Amino acid sequence: MIAIIDYGAGNIFSVKNALDYLGLECKLTSDINEIKAADALILPGVGAFPAAMNMLEKSGLIDTIKEEAAKKPLLGICLGMQMLFEKGYEFEECNGLGLIKGSVRYMDEPDLIIPHMGWNKLEKLNECPLLENIGDNEYVYFVHSYKAECANENI
């Protein structure tokens, strides 16, 4: 079973509908025991980094997520992926989960219109099982104003 972590923020129903469509067993949950029993975890998210981390902290799930991430696959989607990093800098400096070394910062890119929205080619720098069915330079849709800055071993 895949646990979709419900901490009060995020696109949880879109994620659940997608997994249901694919025929995957999944559950929306904020229950620590269900998260521990899951085979894999998904941390969705929409909104601002500090507010989402505050909601995650209030849910009491931070320690459980960190512990379980060491044992099983964890996929962060959108803001959920950003929260996996050590810090975020949206509005203010804010601690993340610290599962990935690095930080999430505003995209100060003079050649891009921010927010960055639209179809762009995905550049794969390393082989990754999550992307094995996606060809090189395929178009994917982006909607973001922030970027992850991390050490090369995390890319």
Identify the residue ranges that each predicted region occupies.
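Generic structural signal for residues in well-ordered beta-strands
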Residues: 26-28, 104
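Short, flexible loop segments at the rims of nucleotide/cofactor-binding pockets, characterized by
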Residues: 18-25, 51-55, 117-121
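Structural motif
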Residues: 42-44
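Structural alpha-helical scaffold elements that stabilize or flank donor/cofactor-binding regions
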Residues: 34-35, 68
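Cysteine-nucleophile active-site neighborhood
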Residues: 47-117
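N-terminal beta1-alpha1 ligand-phosphate binding loop
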Residues: 2-24
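Pocket-forming structural segment of enzyme catalytic cores
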Residues: 86-155
